[in-house]
Amino acid sequence: MSDFSPGQRWISDGEAELGLGTVLSNDFRSVTILFSASQETRTYNTRQAPLTRVMFGSGDRVLSADGWKMIVDESRESRGLITYVGEDEHGNLRELPEAKLADTMQFDQARDRLLTGQVDRNDWFDLRFRTLHHFQRIERHPALGLSGPRIDLIPHQLYIADEVSRRHAPRVLLADEVGLGKTIEAGLILHRLLLNGRIERALILVPDSLTHQWLVELLRRFSLDVRLLNETQSQAHGLANPFETAQLVLASQNWLFANPHRQEQAEASQFDLLIVDEAHHLAWSEEESGASYQCVERLSSKIPGLLLLTATPEQMGLASHFARLRLLDPERYHDFERFKEEEQHYGEVAGAIDALERLPGDAEAREAIDAVVDDRDSQALLATLANPEADAAQHESARGQLREALLDRHGTGRVMFRNSRRHVGGFPERRLHRVSLEMPPAYRRVVRRLERDEDYLDELLIESEMDHPDVLIYPDAMYRALSNDPLNVEPWWHIDRRINWLLERLSDDGEEGFANDKVLIIAHHRDTALGLAEGLRVLGGIHAPVFHEGLSLIERDRAAAAFADEEDGSQVLVCSEIGSEGRNFQFCRHLVMFDLPQHPDQLEQRIGRLDRIGQKHAIELHVPTFVGSPGERLLRWYHEGMDAFSAPHGVGSDLFEAFGDALADALLDDDSLNEIIAETRTLFSARLAEQDAGRNRLLELNACRPAKAEAVIEAIRELDHDPALPRYIERALDIFGVDSQELGAGIMHLQPSPQMLDGLPGLVKGEEGFSATFDRARALSRDDIQRLSWEHPLTREMMGRILDGTMGNTALALLRHPAISSGRLMAELVFRTHCPAPRSLHLNRFLPPTAVRVLLDESGANLTGKISFTGLSQNLQKVNKSMARDLIKSRHDQLRELLTQGESEAERELPSIIEAGEKRMREQLDGELARLQALAEHNPAVRDVEIDALSRERQALSDAMESTRLRLDSVRVIITADPKGR
């Protein structure tokens, strides 16, 4: 390794795409290199730096930073820096200091290796060419980033992921109902943004109980390696910022929100995307905001992208929902009163969309649409739709375009995506089983006194230190709180008849029993869950793991795993309210609500633990209550007032806000309760009608546009069934030294051989490897099988090593053919386009590295169009390395001339390649920019920063494409030989 000096030019051996680097600084141990073309700075160990000093010799062509070219005659060195002397393209003698070399210059490593006799195996060359071909094809594919994850192809999830991941620094609220896959949507968005280089780092904040679930999901479904950060790990890094130790950081909200110092460190780290799960817990009001909200607000002001996840966006009321929208776009959502006014107009838009179906021929429908359509393009479409003389195809086209325009230009649908079960469809039936039990004397004694004595409630609240109405609807908690009462000598679970009922059902193998099924039990309080489990153990000998917020993450995961185990696992899992939030228990169909929560959204979250995408059975909801108790009255309000157990309706927050206080006062009075139930039912029906006509209707229509979703799915299926993938993987595994064994049923086992190249994901020498399949359905049915795709880490690693390294960039082979005399030479040169640009531009979607193949015979005749790559490769034979070196040495000058001529031949193709890339870019981005600008005139949810970013991106892409150059990627020398082997 040469000595380093500031100003010298070096190139990375393993990352040639970085362009020409400049030494910024160095000392005895390290050197810092700036790669200006790709906006990257790297620091290397001086003793092991994978760098090559750039030194040109006589005859080499160089490019200056000012754009003029020169052929080098000689070079001079002074104080470690080189100055080149030669003639420019006009014949003028000029000097060029190395500091003035163009940052975008490329270096023909293949040329240097070939002329020095370094040749690789012929099958390596073949694999390299095929890798470049497939990489070029896949990088431009519309399903890139969505086809690899281990997921079912569910339309609404894929539509949202595709729509959001196309945006610059997306900031959205993912608000699908419980069980519709918000975590998968967020994972898809994250995966795609990482894969296409739009983002490099992400911070994921989730409730403590969900950290391991997120960790496992991101690894198992998306092959994303995430660092779980906690206080212990943070302290292990000493004074260093722990948030800068990984690309993807997962942290507990409980930990971060309670630690101001760690919050400052997170804010100081340069993340590109922030994901916040269970965002309804971010407390805010017009008077004050909670610590959790303030933390996320500060982080989101520094991090460009933001995904907020919540199944209950309005659980804390409309103001709290507005606050979350304010996090997404503070400029757009700054006035709560104005926001409420906008909400009033969504019904008109939804009505106009429905009216489209009644045209032509309905004058009232025309008026309804006219009221909300005011731009010239939409009016022209409306005229076509209303014209009875237009044909059916014209009507349908105009109707579809108008529907898209109305959805785009109105409402919060651009920043909030909310799908409902009603809109998605295909969910199992919910069955409510009401169980009436006799109230235990200890509970009845308190309830009867409350019914007789109004003042006793105040005494009870003081004595028990409980809130109202908790003291009424959770009798076991009240019993525990009154433990000083001499009558309360037995444990509550010993006198509570719900325990006896549970034990009977758990041992009953009849139709009404649970003996052959898994049962999830949810209670509101942690102490209730703990006592319930103890009662099952002592009274029935049943071991039931408990899942509550007081457990450590490991203890919680252990309890969930014990319940999920089909063979040796527990039949029952007991959960507290908070402890079970966000968990997925869809393998279970029986849910016992030991008590009921106060808020309808919490009730829906309970049911959502089982009622999820993938649930194959009807959901059996068992609610034991005591006759004449406040709990029974609460059940009636839920069931009779709002059909809360039959399906999610999305209006529970409104109903609770309207009747919550009155309901609490009516839990001891049937007459008052009956009035509240009737009023609730009336408002419930009205709210459902408003939903169908207003904002929720718009959100549902906008959250999944079927035609676009189907197009995404078809693109994914195209890659799923790509016949080239298995062939490519088979060749690559063989060359990288991975043994593959067919196990049957479309499954193979991959195992490292002793000769395997190190560092392949999931494969370590001496270990067993893993089983894999190309079939999506088979991979989903078996957790122990990985799914191989073009996006699998193993595939990407092998392709990356080939394209970024020297593997297969030179080769020499023999061609024996009766029609060709022996001793002749051909050179097969493969050039590829190269354009140093920031990864965040995602240039590859328009102009990926593109192969230009040139085949020349020894006279310089271009045979590219006459002899295909495949046809030639099938007729070649290998040559041992010593003979190959001798042949190259003997034809050295001839090869140099062919390399020069081949470059000229390839350069003729470059303008058309750049033009095609520019055209693809303009077709997509010009249309998208025009669409956003048109939307901004009607929909304030379109951010100015988004339009500006897209405009700058378009210009940056155009500038980058203009700097595209060709470089020699690989070369194969072909020598003809006697077909008879003489």
List each model region and its residues.
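Walker A/P-loop
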Residues: 169-189
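A short beta-strand element within the Helicase C-terminal
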Residues: 320-323, 583-595, 620-623
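A conserved SF2-helicase RecA2
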Residues: 601-607, 612-688
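Basic/aromatic-rich interaction segments and small domains that mediate binding to polyanionic partners
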Residues: 3-47, 66-68, 72-103
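Charged, non-catalytic accessory extensions
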Residues: 52, 367-392, 398, 419-518, ...
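N-terminal pre-P-loop "Q-motif" helix
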Residues: 150-170, 494-498
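SF2 helicase/translocase NTPase motor core
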Residues: 100-114, 119-124, 136-151, 156, ...
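SF2 helicase motor core recognition
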Residues: 259, 316-317, 530-533, 574-588, ...
